[in-house]
Every structure is written in C-alpha cells, then in structure tokens.
Amino acid sequence: MEDGKPVWAPHPTDGFQVGNIVDIGPDSLTIEPLNQKGKTFLALINQVFPAEEDSKKDVEDNCSLMYLNEATLLHNIKVRYSKDRIYTYVANILIAVNPYFDIPKIYSSETIKSYQGKSLGTMPPHVFAIADKAFRDMKVLKLSQSIIVSGESGAGKTENTKFVLRYLTESYGTGQDIDDRIVEANPLLEAFGNAKTVRNNNSSRFGKFVEIHFNEKSSVVGGFVSHYLLEKSRICVQGKEERNYHIFYRLCAGASEDIRERLHLSSPDNFRYLNRGCTRYFANKETDKQILQNRKSPEYLKAGSLKDPLLDDHGDFIRMCTAMKKIGLDDEEKLDLFRVVAGVLHLGNIDFEEAGSTSGGCNLKNKSTQALEYCAEKLLGLDQDDLRVSLTTRVMLTTAGGAKGTVIKVPLKVEQANNARDALAKTVYSHLFDHVVNRVNQCFPFETSSYFIGVLDIAGFEYFEHNSFEQFCINYCNEKLQQFFNERILKEEQELYQKEGLGVNEVHYVDNQDCIDLIEARLVGILDILDEENRLPQPSDQHFTSAGHQKHKDHFRLSIPRKSKLAIHRNIAYDEGFIIRHFAGAVCYETTQFVEKNNDALHMSLESLICESRDKFIRELFESSTNNNKDTKQKAGKLSFISVGNKFKTQLNLLLDKLRSTGASFIRCIKPNLKMTSHHFEGAQILSQLQCSGMVSVLDLMQGGFPSRASFHEVYNMYKKSLPDKLARLDPRLFCKALFKALGLNEIDYKFGLTKVFFRPGKFAEFDQIMKSDPDHLAELVKRVNHWLICSRWKKVQWCSLSVIKLKNKIKYRAEACIKMQKTIRMWLCKRRHKPRIDGLVKVGTLKKRLDKFNEVVSALKDGKQEMSKQVKDLEISIDALMAKIKSTMMTREQIQKEYDALVKSSAVLLSALQKKKQQEEEAERLRRIQEEMEKERKRREEDEQRRRKEEEERRMKLEMEAKRKQEEEERKKREDDEKRIQAEVEAQLARQREEESQQQAVLEQERRDRELALRIAQSEAELISDEAQADPGLRRGPAVQATKAAAGTKKYDLSKWKYAELRDTINTSCDIELLAACREEFHRRLKVYHAWKSKNKKRNTETEQRAPKSVTDYAQQNPAVQLPARQQEIEMNRQQRFFRIPFIRSADQYKDPQNKKKGWWYAHFDGPWIARQMELHPDKPPILLVAGKDDMEMCELNLEETGLTRKRGAEILPRQFEEIWERCGGIQYLQNAIESRQARPTYATAMLQNLLK
C-alpha cells in the first residue's frame, strides 16, 4: 500500500507510532509498525496520517511541514524537544514546551538584543519573538496588544510571562528605575501567590493580567497588575505532597534571628497550616547549609530538601527582600507584611475543645493560649479576650417590627469555631495579598498612556483526584479563554476569509458555549444556583448539588459521579458531586464546602473585631474593603453573603472585554511529562494538550490560511505622504499590487481579498517590510513602485500590441476556417446526394470498357460475325442510354442497380453466345479471364454493399444509442420531477441526520478527551480506570459507520471482517454470483474510503490525484446515486459492456493551457457497474493503460451510475472505437501480460482476449 510509504498510527503512550499500511478494512486500516515487523493492529482510517520521509527533520514553523496533521505536529515538537529547541510556531502562535532545566544563554541579554525589531520567522522561535511582534503590532497598528499565555499547571506559563515582561522592559524601557520595578514585582507576587502542587513546584494560585503601558514614543511609562481568584483554601489545608504559599516557608527558612524571635517562628511542622502538607524547603547544597537546624522539620531532616532549578526558599527570601526594597517598601512596611504572615500561621495553631457546660459551645485548649497571645496581642493588634470570644461565639441581632433589637451571643461548636478561625485566616491573608498587589501597582504609576501590552497568566486547566470550588472556578475561566481563542483564531478568522472571498476551506472545531452557559447562565447556571443556595436560611452543599442535577438532568455537559471513568469518583454520592465535561475533558467536582467557599463574608463579630484592630497596618488592610463593601454589608446584616463566584464572573467578563478590544498573540505552554523531569517526552498526554488547546484545528486552518493582513487603505495611507502626485492618484488596491510587484513578492505568498491583502504563514518578514513606517524605507519603496509602474505600463503596451496582432490573426484564421467548414459541408452534402449516381456511372463505365474485348472476340470469329457485332452494338447502345439516363435524371441507388443488373445479364448472355462461337483454346482462355474479372467485380460489388450496410448499421446503432440516452434522460427527468415532490422531506431528514451525526461526533470527541484526562489523572494518582474506559476509543464507530454495520447485518454476506486481499481473491475466483456482487461492492467501497483518505492527507501544494476527469468526480459528489443492493445492481446492469470517451485535462494544466493544446481523452470500459479497463491519452506523454485487478489503486473507483457518464451526451462510444484505440496503444499486450502474471481480474475483456489467443 502507498508504495511502502510510512504513516502515523495511534499509540496509547507515544501518541503516534510510525508504520506501513498492509490492508484496508471497512472503516479502518491495518498497520504494521516499523519497529515491530510481523505484528499488526487496526486503526481507524481518520486517525492515520502520512508521515514525513525524513523522520529526523524538524522545522521551526509547523506550517512548513509537507503534511499538516496532528501526528507530524507532535513528531516535529518531539524532535525539536530532543534537541533542546523548546519553542515552535504554528503560524503566529508559539508552542512552548517546559524543559524542566536551564538551557544556557536562551534568555540572555545578547539573545534579547538579537530579537529586537526582527520579523516573526527570521529568527528561531522564541517567546522574545512573540513579545517583539506584539510591540511592533502596537506601534504600527496603533492598537493595544494582549499576549495570552495558557497551558496546564506546570507547563511553564509563569516563567514565560516573566520572560515577556523582561524582554519588553529591557528592549523598550526608558532606562529608569521603573523598568526594574516591573520586573522585580514578579518575585514578590510569586512569594505571596504561588505554591507547590503535585503537578507544579511553582504553581500560580491566582490569575494576573500585567499591563505594560507605553507613551506616544512607544517607551515604557508604567504598569498595572490585575489579579483574579486567589486560592484561599490553600491557606488552611493542602494535599500531602503540596505546600502552602511560598512566603510561609521562605519566612521560616530565610528570616534573620531577630525577625524570627519577634515573630515567634520555628520550623514548618510546628504550624497547623503547614504541617498537614509537605514541610520540606526548596534548597540546593549551598543554601541547605545556611538554613539552621532548628528551622528544619523532621521530614526535611529525613528526606532532604526539595529540588528545583528555579526555586530556593532561603535564596528566594533574600531576593524577595531585595525586590521589596527596589519597589519602594521600607523596612517597617516589610516587617508589617511578615508580621501578618506570621499572625496567620499562629492563628492556625489556635485549637478548640468541647465545653464542659450544657451550653453546647466550645473553649480554647490550654496549649493554644500562647498561640492566641502571639496572634492577637503581638502580631495582629487584637485583644486576646475579644478574639477568644469572637472565635467561640457568633453575634446575632433580633428584629422586632423591622428594627434591630437585642444582641445575642450564640456559642459555636468545635467544628464551627474551627471554620470561623479558618475564615478569619483566609480573609486576613486575602486582604494582605490585595495590599501587596496594590503596593506593586503604586511602585510603577503612570500619568498618561497611549497603548499597553497586557500579558495574561492565569491558572491552567486543573484536574486532580479531588476537585473543589477552586478548580471549578479555574476551569470555568479556562473555558472562557478557550472560547476567546476559538473566536479570535478560528471563528473570526474564517468569517473574515469568507467575507473577503478567499475561498479557504472551512475548519470545524468544538464549540464550548454550551459548557459556559451551563456554568454562568442567568437563574439556571451553576453559579446562580449556588448563589441562590447561599441566600437560604440553612444552605447545604447537598441541596445545591441536587438542584444542579435536577435543573440540568438532560444536559450533555453535566453528569453524575457514578458515570466517571475513575473508580474513586464512582463512590461519590449523587448529592455530593457532579461531573462537567470541559473542553479538555471531564472533571469530577466534590461539592463539599462549595457553599462555604462561595461566601466571602465573615460573621459580624469577627469582622467588627478585625476592623477595629489597634494595629494601623491591619486597619488599613480592611479599610478599602470596608468602603467597597459598605452597601453589601448593610444587606449582609440579614444574609451575610458576598458571592465569590459571581464576583469572579464579573472580573472575568471585564477581562475578556479588555482582551477583545486588543490585538491578541497566543503562547501555548505544553507540559512534557507528569513527573516534571527533563528530557522525558510523553507523547499521548502532549497530544491531548495540543488537541485541547486548539492547535490541531489551527493547523487545519493554516493549510490554506493567512495569519497576517492589512487593508489596502491602511497601506496606502502609510505611504501617502511620501507619494508623488502621479502615484497619489492611484487606487489603493492598485497601489498595493504595484508595491508587492516592486518588492518581487511571490504571488503564492499573498492573496488579495475585497478590502485587504493577506499573507501566508511564514511570510511575516515580507509583511513587516511593507508595514515598516520608517521614512527612508518608505521613500525607497516608493521609488521601486514608480519604477515597476513604468516597466509594467511599457510591458502592457507591448502586450496590447501583441494582443491586437494575435486578434487580427485569429479573426483571419477563423474566417478561413469558416470557409473551409462551409466547403467541407457543401462537399459532403453534394457527395451524399450524388454518390449513388457517381457509383452507378463508374460501374456502368467499367462495363462499357469491356465491350472493346467483346469486339476483339467478334472480329476474330469466322462465322456469325455480323450477328454478333449487332448484339454487341445493341449492348453498347443500352449502356450509353443508361449512362445518359443516370446523368440526366435523379435515379435512386436501387433503380441504377436494377438496370445495371439487366445490362450485366445481357453481357453475360452475349458472352455465353461468344463462348459457343469460339472454340479455340486461345479464345477460351481470354473468355476465362473476362469471367474472372467479372467475378472479381462481383466480389468487389458485394464488399461495397457489405461495407455500406455496415456503415448504415453503425449509424443505426448510434441513433439507437442516442435515442436510448434521450429516453434515459426523459426517464431521469420524470424521476427528478417525482423526487422534487418529496425533496423537502428528504432534505429535512438529511439535515436532522447530519445534525445527529454532528452531535454524536461531538459526543465521541468529548468522550475521547474524557478518557485521556482520566488516564492522565490515573497516571498521576496511581489510580486504575474502569474496564469500560479502557476500551480503545480509537475504534469507537461514528454514526455513519454504525449505520453501515447495521445495514451489513441485514445482508446475506457480512464482509466487514474480510481483508482487502481476501475480497480481491474472491472476486478473481468465486463463481457465486451473489457473493461476487457483494465482494465487488465492498471492494470498491473500501477503495473510495481509501482514496478519500489519500486526498484529505495529500502533500501541501500538490494537486489531488485524478483517476477520472474532474467532471466525473464532481458529478459523483453533487449527485450521490441511490445505492442498490449489489445483486440487484448486477442484474439491472446484466453485465452490459459499455464504453465511454470524454475530454480530459489535468488540473495542473487547466489554467496554463488556454489553447487546450494539452487536452487529452479519457476512455473507460465498464463491465456491468464496475470499470474493467481505462485509458488516458495525452498529446505530450505516452498513453496510460490500466486494467482492473492490476491497477485498482489508479483507476476510477466509482460505479457507472455514480459517474453520470450515461447521462452525458456523446460520451458513449461503440466497442469497435474503444478496441481500435486500445489495440493501437498496446493494450492487448498489456492485458495479456497482466493475465499471465495473474494480476488481471476476470472480466469480459480478459475472457475475450483468452478466447482470441486460443
């Protein structure tokens, strides 16, 4: 198959493996892996892709690959990753693979300088190139830009964000202190907002949108950081292998002895908020020695430090203090930050126990007294007793007649007191983080800003064994960002192509709007259902979950936990969780604490206490919040509720509005493995990331896409000031055309739309050259345009003169041709009218010539000479009379023949009489010769008659064929008229089927992603997935295939499991008519599927293989024939032998040959419904001969009805006409060789040739 060319086929762990096609199945291909010769496996045909011939080759832009598909995309990334080339383009989108180690000099200052002002594609792929492109787009287009850095947790988003910021400030900063502050703000934000998770050692547990603002001179003037959704639950509890926020550990590891004593710090295992997770520090050999022993936990002393090339708690503490100083924080403010952090730690050590009294409340444990003192008096500025009371009781106000009445203190149970303590800790830390962000923003203020470049770094799609409200919000955010990506890159791009008339093929992608509606829809969305639950007097997580399931019981995106592919999730009760099918896969959320985590308000006594702190810094932390939420709190007197979910939704919508108002660049970060180790490439999970991030859809779009564009007027206005008057009068479109021609651009690299010019992927340098607004550069380009216009106009004059001469010659040639045609037609008409008389005169004239021989015989006679002479004379008179009659009257062929026969008879009688008179041998010999000549004449006459009859028979057959075609055409029209009456119903049914098939395909695609995500969770959590989930989704059948298999079940023969070779052998050897018909049908159906696969996966910039003329294939696509059962089709055709001939021109020559000099002919011989022999005749190449069996892959795979040849006027020819051409081109020998080598399939043609050879 495919001449042994390699293909990519699915592999469970590597994503794809290379192999060869060895057989074609009903809807799958049999693949033999190259590294496992002799072993084969089945792969769905739409999951098999052609491979590049050079497996070690890599390209910087995946759009440069010969084959553009997800397998070659994955392989190219893998090859580059193995060479430490972690960046790759897909058009203007950057794919960044996390290397998990430091690559030397890749981010050095020298590297930054090398990318400044360089067009995308002129330098190797890099995050700096995207940053520079965003800056140049902002400068040229006068439009703010955004860079969206996305990817899973641990994929490298935070690091790439830092590199973008560093590049912009170093390259285009003013050289002042503000540039350093923007860069130095990152360590501070990371310390308070990043933490170690199981999938990322430096995971951002909040989202941020960093704006770098520029003035009118495109210099950095300031910045602004917006933050979203800090993960507050991490403050109180973490997973076993996870840590709290970095600041806690860095403070314990790196604080000086003075600070440690003032803040009463010790090792992490002594604090409740740290000791339930990992208590080890990040450190290297040097810093490990600098950390004092009393600051190390037992776990650290036993297992050693955590290792990460980018993290070091002791060193990072020092770097954080340096960053604080650079952004303007003095020692007092720095100590305030540390004091609040330590206060949160000590707050977590306050513990409770049941009270001995009957009140049902609780008291502080004795061992918590010191923690209470440290936290209240020394760190947070609170009264110990007030804090104790506020943590163990809750203040309620009775109401009477709508007015507030008596204050009642309600004792809290131990669990409630623990929740109150944790809520206070989360609130304090959250306000502290808000303060850090505000101080960061204050350190780089700006008065005026012309434009900005925003860099979005937000937590990637998260999926753990246990997922809660935080993961729900993060994944909701990622759904919205994926939709923005779909809109900006796929939807808006395709709408623009369609609007501009570029003719780019449509690319389908998964629309996740239904998932977003499920979460945020008004009243019925999960967020609104959760808010409604929070407003109830006694809200519960179980009631909220049940309400969600009830309102969306038939929603495709929402499911119950027991349908999960992971066994651990199937144990979750109906009212304790739900599954949402996200764009990246299904995630099971445990709804315990959803209600609690959605409420951002403290109960009244704690809120009042913290707002009235004696510490000025603490009061300032809560003052801004108090002012902002004043109205909310007044309402909260009753409900005490501030919705976290809806607050986040509002922030997210504002962010997306900002993104939509800017130009967008995308960096897709990829996590190469789950172990976070270097040089380890897990193909399957990387492929899943590429598919979920839309890279495969982008690759499909970019096969014919144009990522760069500019409007004609925009380009024209840029050059207008530099144009002389004669050029200024040019139409903008014409000016752009002249500009591109002057630059010598290849027409393949760009395309003109209605209002814009578009550039192919990889042509950003050419685009930037045109859009460069440097005055000297503009003047140079204008000079080139002027030169090109002069040359083009002179060439146009030359071409016009040549065209006029050609036109004159063509008119003269056509006039001569018309005269020649008229002469020929008149000659033919005249010949048809007078040919019987001319033929008669020729025959009678021949008879007259024989009279001389008669006279010679008579003159030699001795007796009866006079009598014989008279008879000869009479015969001559009769002949002359007949000749005169033929010339003077319009006699028919029959009349002439009758009188001619009479003369022949008379001459025969006369000859007989002469024979009697002539006795001598000499005379007898001469008479014998005359007899022979007459016999020859008779035979010639008979042959002429036979030829004439044959011509008449052929004319009759052609007339019958034409009449039959007209009859078939009339019957077809009648059928069409009948079909039109039910067409509306049929189309509606087909539309429903297509919609159902599309929905089913979306379900299958979503299930595939769900399974892949479950596998990745299973790998990371050492969990087993269900047997049902283990079933290979690659062999799940689509609706069309299921329908085919269902139909096959009703047939006599089930051929779905037969191999391609078995079908072929059965066709060649079987005598069972029904089996033969079924095998032929299945054989050609598989051929169609295989050729469709080849056409879809052809090389870039290559024409589709033509096994039949375009008119035939187009007809088959536009008019799908009704599929008759194979047996019925064979009977209806009755193995008729039909022959066809139609003009044929290769698509590559279609527009290069206006004179049709390369037009050839396509001949086909159909044996019943299927083709048996095929010929292509071209004027500039040898004839192409094909026979069924030997050349199935190159022959037309359509049946006769599908080709529409029987409906083409003049297409059908006589068998003799086909056989003459076939024999002349060496077809007999070709077919004989195929028969002798047992490659030809038994057909009418093979049987006839074998009989002829016998």
From Swiss-Prot:
Expression across tissues: Expressed in all tissues examined including kidney cortex, intestinal mucosa, liver, lung, heart, jowl muscle, brain cortex and medulla, and in the epithelial cell line, LLC-PK1 (at protein level). In the kidney, located to the brush border of adult kidney proximal tubule cells.
Region (Three-helix bundle): 836-917
InterPro entries: Kinesin_motor_dom_sf, MYO6_lever, Myosin-VI_CBD, Myosin_head_motor_dom-like, Myosin_N, Myosin_S1_N, MYSc_Myo6, P-loop_NTPase
Positions bearing Phosphothreonine: T406
One cellular-component annotation, GO: nucleus
Alphabetical list of Pfam families matching this protein: MYO6_lever, Myosin-VI_CBD, Myosin_head
Residues at which ATP binds: G151, E152, S153, G154, A155, G156, K157, T158
Disulphide-bridged cysteine pairs: none
GO MF entries: actin filament binding; ADP binding; ATP binding; calmodulin binding; cytoskeletal motor activity; microfilament motor activity
Modified residues (Phosphoserine): S267, S605, S1026
Spans annotated as Required for binding calmodulin: 783-811
Top-level taxon: Eukaryota
Domain Myosin N-terminal SH3-like positions: 2-53
Record's subunit section: Homodimer; dimerization seems to implicate the unfolding of the three-helix bundle region creating an additional calmodulin binding site, and cargo binding. Component of the DISP/DOCK7-induced septin displacement complex, at least composed of DOCK7, LRCH3 and MYO6. Able to function as a monomer under specific conditions in vitro. Forms a complex with CFTR and DAB2 in the apical membrane of epithelial cells.
Family: Belongs to the TRAFAC class myosin-kinesin ATPase superfamily. Myosin family.
Protein name, as recorded: Unconventional myosin-VI
Source organism: Sus scrofa
